[in-house]
């Protein structure tokens, strides 16, 4: 029964994650255990576990008397997401890059190409997350990688929200190419600097006027 609850919780968490990231569930939207349990035909136990998973991914917040709600996307939240991701992804990259094999570099390049070939913002953002995950996976630091998975999903919410407001068109990501080039040349410090600058872009774009 415990394994069944965990499987159901994962299914619920994945479905709600997609709704939050896509914007179908807007910031501060309430999530009620009884409603979610009824929708998925489950007890409250896997719903509570799903909510814990979503909170660990920075997608929902739980507060006394307010219950569980979709995490906000205000300036303060954006700054927090960006600063955490900037710091943690560089730590992961510094530990991952010395372990790269040709297979790792090929995976990074494949994600880059898929992002370049994306025809929709959803396709682009899926490939973008794959690129950033491929950069750091060899670091072999599971807790750090789990935190970064959540931060990338939170970042995707920002990207998709901005795309809905400002529109999106296919483009080549020059930052990604420069990062990959530096890594191929074993210029790890330079790659980390490029990654920091690249990850900070989202906060600048989220400011009024994109300044």
Region locations from a protein language model:
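Hydrophobic side-chain positions on well-ordered alpha-helices
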Residues: 19, 115-118, 136, 182, ...
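Hydrophobic, amphipathic alpha-helical faces that serve as interaction scaffolds
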Residues: 84-100, 129-166, 201-205
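Alpha-helix C-terminal capping/termination sites
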Residues: 98, 120, 184-185
């Amino acid at each position: 029964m415990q394994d069944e609850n965990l499987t159901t919780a994962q299914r619920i968490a994945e479905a709600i994650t997609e709704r939050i990231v896509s914007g179908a569930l807007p910031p501060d939207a309430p999530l009620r255990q009884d409603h979610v349990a009824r929708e998925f035909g489950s007890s409250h136990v896997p719903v509570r576990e799903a909510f814990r998973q979503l909170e660990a991914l920075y997608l929902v917040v739980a507060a006394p008397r307010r219950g569980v709600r979709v995490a906000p996307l205000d300036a303060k939240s954006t700054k927090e997401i960006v600063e955490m991701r900037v710091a943690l992804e560089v730590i992961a990259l510094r530990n991952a890059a010395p372990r790269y094999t040709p297979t790792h570099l090929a995976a990074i390049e494949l994600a880059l190409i898929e992002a370049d070939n994306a025809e929709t913002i959803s396709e682009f953002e899926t490939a973008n997350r794959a690129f950033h995950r491929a950069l750091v996976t060899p670091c072999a630091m599971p807790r750090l990688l789990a935190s970064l998975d959540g931060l990338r999903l939170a970042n995707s919410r920002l990207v998709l929200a901005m795309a809905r407001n400002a529109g999106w068109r296919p483009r080549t990501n020059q930052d990604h190419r420069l990062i990959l080039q530096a890594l191929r040349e074993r210029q790890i410090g330079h790659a980390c600097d490029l990654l920091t600058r690249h990850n900070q872009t989202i906060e600048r774009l989220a400011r009024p006027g994109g300044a």
